[in-house]
Amino acid sequence: LYNSRNQLTQLTGDDKNISYTYDPAGNLTEEHSTEHKKIYSYDTYNRNTEINGNDFTQKNHYDAEGYRYSIEENDKVTNFVYRCGIMLAELDEAGNQAKTYTLGNEYAGHVSELNNSLTSENKAASYYITDEQGSIRYILDQSGEVQNYYQYSAFGETIISEETTPNRLRYNAQTEDELTGLYYLRARYYAPGIGRFTQEDVIYNDGLNLYAFH
C-alpha cells in the first residue's frame, strides 16, 4: 500500500506484513513487523544518524561534505577515507588501515582490486570480478581461488552470499551495511528488499516517485 506521497506504508504477501512510518520530511522513521522493529533517526540535514533494531544498533557519522566517515555497528567502529566521494580505505577505531581499495579503468563504482588487510602477518591482495552492472560477483585471492561469491535480485538484494573474507562492496559496487541490509549511496540509503530509497529524492531528478530506484 502507498499513500499520496508515493510512500510505501504497508507490505504484505509471502508471509510478510510490514508497516512503514515517515516523518514530515519524507524520511523513513519506523519499520515494523511481527518479527522485527527498526527505528530510524536523522539529524537536521535529514542524514540518517542511527538505526535501532531488535538486536543491533548502527550509528552513522558524516563529515562537513556530507560523506559518511564513520560507522558504529554495535561495538565495532570503522572509519572511511574518501577522495571525490570514492571510498579509498577503511580504518579501524584506532586509525590503523584495515583495507585500501584500488580503482580500475571504468567508472568510479567499478572497484577492480582490494588490497589488503594491512597487518604484517595477514597482508594479501584480493581481486574483484564484476558483472555488466558493476556488481561484485566474485572475489579472488592472489592465486586466483574464489574467496567470495554473490548473486543478487533484480533490485540488488543479496540472495546468495558465500564469504571467506569480509566485504562491504556488493550490488553496483556500492557499500552494503551488514546489520541493516541497506546500501549507503552517499545522498541516501537504499533498501534492496523493497527496491526503494528510505528518503525522498530532494533533487527531484527521477520523476514523480521520489523513492524509486532507477
Residue ranges and their predicted role:
Residues L1, Y20, Y40, K59-N60, ...:
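A residue-level detector for well-ordered beta-strand positions
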Residues G195:
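Acidic, glycine-enriched catalytic cores built around paired aspartates
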